[in-house]
Amino acid sequence: MTSPTRPDRSPIDVVGSVTAPEAAAAPRRRRPRPLAVIGVVLAAVLVSASGAYAANAAGAELPVATAVVQETPPTVIDAPAVAWPSYGAGAISAVGVQGPAAGGMLASYGSTGQLPIGSIAKVVTALVVLSAKPIAEGTDGETIAFTSTDVGYYNDSVAENGSVAPVSAGLELTEREALTVLMLPSANNYAKSLAVWAFGSEEGYLAAARTWLDERGLTGTVVADTSGLSPATVSTTLEMVVLGELLIGDPVLAPIVAMPSAVIPGVGTVENTNTLLGQAGVDGIKTGTTDEAGACLLFSLDATVEGRPVTMVGVVVGARTHPQLAADVLTLIPTVEAGFRTVTLTEEGQDFGSYTSAWGESAVAESGEAQSLLVWGATTVTTSVSLDPVEVVADGQEVGTVNVDVNGQAYPVPLVADGTIEDPGFGWRVTNPGELFG
């Protein structure tokens, strides 16, 4: 029996066909898993974010350190009791000390208006003459030849019952010698002789004196003559003190008015009319006496108060006699000296505040050096502190100011850091985002 004939397989069918075992052995492709992909992405994002945060933290501004101000209680000093005379008027100052009274005076009493000043006017005469005819250091100035005209001035002064000193035609004195005769015995005739010598006439002097006074703001002082004998020659107590300050600052006149006496060739011994010289530190300046002015004294003195040297200038006018005036000024002086006090602005290394950083470091704001101020009279001292905002601080760095107010006058003192606040570093920055970024 013939078997059924199978259809012939084409070569393609043979080659292309796959048996079941072969098919089972072929590898299978896997589809990506979504969760794995997400994990990789998140990891990359976290790494990137961490790097960005770290970079931001490393470069971010640090928080400002907390500043605390150390409060300083105010200081109050009571006014002293000054023993002014019961008559006349007066004022007193201390060179370089701002006083509480008008014009920076320490104290004053009586009239503040214009008053006759007698021979205190010779302070103006001497200063104005020297402004026109200065005496060079180490010299005695020009030589002045006196004539019969000067003898006439002497006779006129005698007739007016004014103070005089001898003069003769042909007498020659240096300018320094002539000024000595003017100031010590208060010679009226020498006041006119010097004024005419320097300015050509009394009128020329009066015009120059007016200009000189105006240039110094002394508008309350009026000179109607060279000696002060005229009642129209007036000033205020405040301006008389200023004139005294100008005189003691002059290198020619200050030594002259401090001399008790002097021997002048052709004139003789001249005595200083200021009997207080050498008492209570008094070393000047000028007496004055007229019926209208009474007995007057413009005085200066050197004292040591609160361990410091102080020069004071004062004036008292209107006394009945010079002995009474001298006694009253001697009573006055210690009561004025008692009114000085030293006010401490800052002590060396005094704490006025502190800084504390968010990471626990601290520094103190302190004054670098001790500073003090000499004051007189009723005084109120208050202190205010201004600390600069800082993140880090170097030792010795200026960090603020303490303003010490003394009777309305501010005295600023810089504050410096005692201690160091440093950058806390990368570790603190990356672990304290709340402090760093708020």
Language-model features: locations:
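Terminal targeting segments of Actinobacterial cell-envelope proteins
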Residues: 1-36
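Active-site-adjacent loops and short helices of periplasmic peptidoglycan-processing enzymes
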Residues: 4, 56-238, 245-251
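Conserved SxxK-family serine transpeptidase/carboxypeptidase catalytic domain
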Residues: 5-8, 54-62, 77-78, 339-438
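Hydrophobic membrane-insertion alpha-helices, especially the h-region
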Residues: 38-53
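Short Gly/Pro-enriched turn/cap motifs at secondary-structure boundaries
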Residues: 80-82, 170, 287-291, 391-393
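Solvent-exposed coil/turn segments that connect beta secondary-structure elements
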Residues: 95-97, 131-133, 147-151, 197-199, ...
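Acidic/histidine-enriched alpha-helical segments
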Residues: 252-266, 344-357
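A penicillin-recognizing enzyme superfamily signal
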Residues: 254-340
